[in-house]
């Protein structure tokens, strides 16, 4: 009966929004805590009649483990339970989650590994996947191996039960990490999106996980899918109003889009006379190495590039050509994922440019001449709540691809972006 009581408690927590509206989100933590206290009371009434001490300790530990934060009492109950009965896989898993909550990743790893030695199970596999991504690695090679192993463990968890949304979600996070440790290989962001979608599809509980919406929104923002990012941050904030970072992310992204569109429309607010002077010394000599027949483009094409106007660029990748203009504004926004600037060409067309993987010290100044070899043009049409944004931009994946004032950029101008995502606090 104790097992049923605790299972019901977890069901209450995980299916909270099936019986409550989003307006109750602020009460969820206290409602779960109240339910936990009631469950403990009922369990303690039955304690005397229980013959198996280890089983009672396990269920009491599981009950306390329902809360987001570390519980010393839970740790003690679970430690005693697995000492009495080392074969209790659920005990090892719950104890590992307690170590995770107090930040002891080595202790957590040992528990999940120990549980797997008793019996292969999806909970240990996916939890170990999470732990491996949080463990510090001595060097980038080891870090890469840890992330690959993390993907493998989460995949094994999914294979054991394809209807478990939590395993799919953790696989999504593993692919998200792999995307950033593998030089931002597009196939891994696609796999992350696909795992997140599967998590929602197979499991109603997963779709009310604020972490899923937040982590996916981070990836949407990096991929410049701004409408989806805003919707994700907004949904996550509604599901967990106590998590301040969420409302901040949504607000930051909206402010960024407002600023960018306003600056692009006003050509960086540069006065007409100054703009004419700036553009008068914009010549094809600014092309620098791009004008050489030996120039190797990012796509691998060898040969000089033809300078073209911004208005003549087509949607997507523009092979064999280079966009050329003067910087009229730059923006290194708070919580930024990209260095953003605006450039104006000889026709006085203004274009937003987003540059990724930039070192904090790197930037361009108003008046600089910038050449973008084989530009990637994107069109944004964004609607969120009562706001709409419509603009075009050029995405550049590294400052090393740009020619500024006729020169290639120094290797130190690039630092590979990593994304901060919130691991599930299970």
Predicted segments, located by residue:
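Residue-level recognition of tetratricopeptide repeat
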Residues: 53, 88, 121-122, 164, ...
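Residue-level detector of the short coil/turn that links helix A to helix B
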Residues: 68-69, 103, 136, 145, ...
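OB-fold (S1/OB) nucleic-acid-binding surfaces
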Residues: 318, 328-357
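Short nucleic-acid-contacting surface segments enriched for D/E, G, S/T with interspersed K/R
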Residues: 357-373
């Amino acid at each position: 009966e104790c097992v049923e009581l605790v299972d019901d408690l977890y069901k209450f927590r995980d299916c909270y929004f099936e019986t409550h509206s989003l307006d109750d989100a602020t009460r969820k933590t206290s409602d779960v805590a109240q339910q936990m206290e009631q469950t403990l009371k009922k369990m303690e009434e039955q304690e005397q009649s229980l013959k198996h001490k280890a089983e009672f300790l396990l269920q009491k530990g599981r009950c306390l483990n329902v809360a987001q934060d570390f519980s010393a009492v839970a740790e003690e109950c679970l430690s005693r339970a697995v000492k009495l009965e080392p074969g209790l896989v659920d005990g090892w898993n719950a104890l590992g989650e307690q170590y995770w909550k107090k930040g002891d990743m080595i202790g957590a790893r040992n528990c999940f590994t120990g549980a797997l030695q008793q019996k292969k199970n999806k909970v240990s596999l996916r939890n170990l996947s999470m732990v491996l991504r949080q463990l510090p690695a001595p060097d980038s090679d080891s870090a890469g191996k840890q992330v690959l192993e993390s993907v493998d463990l989460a995949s094994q968890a999914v294979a054991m039960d394809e209807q478990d949304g939590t395993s799919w979600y953790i696989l999504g996070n593993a692919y998200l990490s792999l995307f950033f440790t593998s030089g931002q290989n597009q196939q891994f962001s696609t796999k992350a999106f696909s795992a997140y979608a599967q998590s929602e599809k197979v499991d109603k509980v997963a779709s009310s996980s604020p972490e899923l919406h937040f982590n996916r929104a981070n990836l949407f923002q990096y991929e410049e899918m701004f409408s989806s990012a805003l919707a994700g941050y907004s949904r996550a904030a509604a599901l967990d109003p106590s998590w301040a970072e969420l409302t901040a992310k949504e607000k930051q992204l909206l402010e960024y889009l407002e600023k960018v569109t306003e600056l692009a429309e006003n050509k960086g607010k540069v006065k007409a006379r100054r703009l004419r002077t700036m553009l008068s010394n914009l010549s094809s000599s600014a092309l620098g190495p791009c004008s050489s027949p030996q120039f190797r483009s990012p796509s691998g094409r060898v040969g000089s590039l033809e300078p073209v106007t911004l208005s003549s660029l087509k949607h997507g990748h523009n092979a064999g050509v280079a966009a050329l203009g003067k910087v009229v504004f730059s923006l290194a926004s708070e919580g930024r994922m990209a260095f953003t600037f605006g450039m104006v060409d000889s026709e006085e067309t203004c274009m937003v440019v987003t540059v990724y993987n930039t070192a904090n010290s790197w930037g361009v100044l108003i008046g600089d001449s910038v050449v973008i070899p084989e530009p990637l043009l994107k069109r944004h049409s964004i609607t969120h709540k009562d706001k709409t944004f419509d603009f075009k931009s050029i995405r550049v994946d590294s400052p090393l691809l740009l020619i500024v004032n006729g020169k290639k950029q120094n290797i130190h101008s690039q630092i590979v972006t990593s994304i901060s995502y919130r691991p599930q606090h299970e």
